[in-house]
Each structure stands twice: as C-alpha cells, then as structure tokens.
C-alpha cells in the first residue's frame, strides 16, 4: 500500500499518521498538513480500494484488516512508533491499531468518532445507501456535503462544492468497495474493548455534527481510561475542513500535550 511521507522537520521527529473517513482519501487532511509538517513527520495515504491504492475489497472486509494493512505499510516504511489522527471511520481504525499494536501507537486523536454506530448515524447511512442504489455514484456524491458541512458554510461556497462534487465523482471508489467499507464501519463495535486502550487519547467533536451526534464522543470519553474531550461549537462532521483554525489549534495542543504526557509516564 502506497504511503505519502513528509520529510521529518528535525532528527527523530515524532510521526503522525492521518486516517480519513469513509471517503478514504488522504487529501481530506489538506487543511492540516502545513501546520503539522512544521512539527512532525506526517503520513497520509489513500485507503485500500480508494484513490492511488486501487483494489477489489472482499465482502468481509473489516476495520481490523484496515488497521493491519496500514501497520504493515508503516513497518515496511521503517516506522515503528506513531501517533494516529483518525476521522470517523479513521478513528475506528485508530482504536483498532491501539488495541492490536499497543507498542507502536503513541497517541490517538479521535475526530467525530464513536464506540459503535449510533441509531441516528445508521439512519443517515441507510438514506445514503438508498440514494446510491437508486441514483448511482452521482446521487451519493451530491448528497454527501449535506452530512459533512453546516448549511451556512455550504451556501457561501456553492462553486467550491460543485468542483468538489466533480472531483469526487471522477475518483469515486466504486459501489462495491464503498459498500464493503461501509459495512465494515457498521459492524465495528468497541464498546467491550475500549477500556483496553492504554495510550492517551484526545477526542475532538463538533456539537453541530449532523451525521455523528456529539453524544457519541461523550460515550467514547467515558469508555476510554486515559482520554480528554474537546467540543467545537461549530463545524459539522468535517469540522477540520470548515473551521481549520480552531481545529488545528486543538489538534496541535493535543498532540504536544499527549506526547509529553506519554514520555513523562515512561
């Protein structure tokens, strides 16, 4: 699996791995790259079955497989220890990495994540699946911003959204791969295992997230033994895109604090 690695800003700089959500594209993190690369060696990638890592995914594809293939790619790149920043599905992959490779994951940042899929989130995906079956890739892509962004933010950026729709349609991961990745997301359940995650965790959520209620992050915070929660009052599901200034400050402060906290505990 292909990874994109930024040059380390200094010798032995900590490594931060960015894991996007269901869309799978590493470019999702573009608003964070410049600030992160000043302090960390940053790893971005298109998830298997998407973008520049094309593949046909098995019907039983799972979050555990997503975690294993990423860890193997990191090891192959010479990376043994890394912090993880995961958004939604990416946060699930991050938790799986922390469970399966505890000696490697130094810190976990969960952005609009959850323990197991919420009834409201499931309902949103049911609607989106119906759109996919009835209207194909175009209907899925055109509906997606409604679940990602606040209405006023979208209304002020109509030309940008049209361009994003065209790009997403041109690079659509394919119906079968999308549904198999979505099914992996829906099957994931960390409610009985989260207390085994020992690395420090920062939880970031947006109170106006239409897709994943912020209560999911509260449940995650209660279940994780070493976690802190930060709530953004605005930004929607893709709060790192819509309000990068606020998000980046939380992310940078969280990474610095948790990495220091971990080193002090060693």
UniProtKB/Swiss-Prot annotation:
Its EC number is 3.5.1.-. HAMAP family: RutD (MF_00832). The keyword Hydrolase applies. This is Putative carbamate hydrolase RutD. It holds the Pfam family Abhydrolase_1. One of its GO terms (biological process) is uracil catabolic process. Belongs to the AB hydrolase superfamily. Hydrolase RutD family. SUPFAM superfamilies: alpha/beta-Hydrolases. Involved in pyrimidine catabolism. May facilitate the hydrolysis of carbamate, a reaction that can also occur spontaneously. It comes from the Bacteria. GO terms for molecular function: hydrolase activity, acting on carbon-nitrogen (but not peptide) bonds, in linear amides. It catalyses: carbamate + 2 H(+) = NH4(+) + CO2. Keywords: Hydrolase.
């Amino acid at each position: 699996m292909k990874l994109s690695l930024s040059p380390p800003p200094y010798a032995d700089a900590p490594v931060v791995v960015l894991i996007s959500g269901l869309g799978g594209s590493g470019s999702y993190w573009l608003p964070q790259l410049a600030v992160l690369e000043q302090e960390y060696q940053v790893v971005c990638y298109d998830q298997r079955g998407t973008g520049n890592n094309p593949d046909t995914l098995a019907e039983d594809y799972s979050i555990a497989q997503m975690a294993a293939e990423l860890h193997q790619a990191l090891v192959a790149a010479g990376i043994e220890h890394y912090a993880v920043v995961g958004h939604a599905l990416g946060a699930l992959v991050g938790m799986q990495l922390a469970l399966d490779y505890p000696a490697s994951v130094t810190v976990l940042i969960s952005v609009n994540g959850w323990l197991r899929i919420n009834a409201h989130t499931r309902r949103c995906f049911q609607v989106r699946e119906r759109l996919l079956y009835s209207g194909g890739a175009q209907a899925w892509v055109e509906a997606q911003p409604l679940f990602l962004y606040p209405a006023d933010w979208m209304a002020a950026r109509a030309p940008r959204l049209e361009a994003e729709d065209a790009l997403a349609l041109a690079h659509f991961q394919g119906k079968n791969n999308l549904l198999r990745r979505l099914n992996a997301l829906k099957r994931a359940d960390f409610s009985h295992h989260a207390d085994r995650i020992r690395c420090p965790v920062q939880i970031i959520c947006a109170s106006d997230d239409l897709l994943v209620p912020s209560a999911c992050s509260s449940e995650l915070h209660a279940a994780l033994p070493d976690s802190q929660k930060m709530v953004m009052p605005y930004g929607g599901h893709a709060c790192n895109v819509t309000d990068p200034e606020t998000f980046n400050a939380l992310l940078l402060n969280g990474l610095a604090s948790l990495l220091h906290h971990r080193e002090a505990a060693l």
